[in-house]
């Protein structure tokens, strides 16, 4: 029995090793098929006005700082990050609309935000429909 388990474990690690050695695709795309060229477009869906604008503005500043640092260091796999920002006005319905616009009109590869749980719940439905990851 232990010999069988050893063989299964070895086969598992061998398959992981072979997958890791595989060639990556020449063209990359996000889940909804938006191709990633020389830049990776990241949507920012934040509360920049309204009742909880302080949360959204603080997060937006942090995101901008991180993107600037990443781009200065050469980007991600040589690709620069580009931010596309939408103000959801601290409203759940507007958060959904902002995510829809970012995913469909702006063709972003991922969306960061919103900052509040109710807005995230509304935006996550859009993420599920469009296949654009929501962070």
Which residues make up each language-model segment?
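Positively charged n-region of N-terminal signal peptides that target proteins for export
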Residues: 1-5
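Sec-dependent N-terminal signal peptides
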Residues: 7-13
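C-terminal motif of bacterial Sec signal peptides marking the signal peptidase cleavage site
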Residues: 16-20
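Beta-alpha junction/loop-to-helix N-cap segments that form part of ligand/metal-binding clefts
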Residues: 25-28, 55-59, 73-135
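Short coil-to-beta-strand
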Residues: 34-43, 132-135
């Amino acid at each position: 029995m232990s010999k069988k388990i050893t063989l299964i474990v070895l086969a598992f690690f061998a398959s992981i090793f072979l997958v890791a050695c595989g060639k990556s695709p020449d063209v990359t795309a996000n889940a909804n098929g938006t191709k990633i060229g020389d830049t990776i477009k990241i949507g920012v869906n934040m509360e920049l006005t309204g009742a909880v604008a302080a949360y959204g503005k603080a997060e937006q500043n942090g995101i901008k700082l991180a993107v600037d640092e990443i781009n200065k260091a050469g980007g991600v796999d040589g690709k620069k990050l580009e931010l596309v920002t939408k103000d959801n006005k601290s409203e759940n319905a507007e958060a959904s609309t902002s995510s829809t616009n970012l995913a469909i009109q702006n063709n972003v590869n991922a969306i960061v935000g919103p900052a509040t749980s109710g807005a995230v719940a509304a935006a996550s439905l859009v993420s599920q429909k469009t296949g654009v990851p929501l962070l």
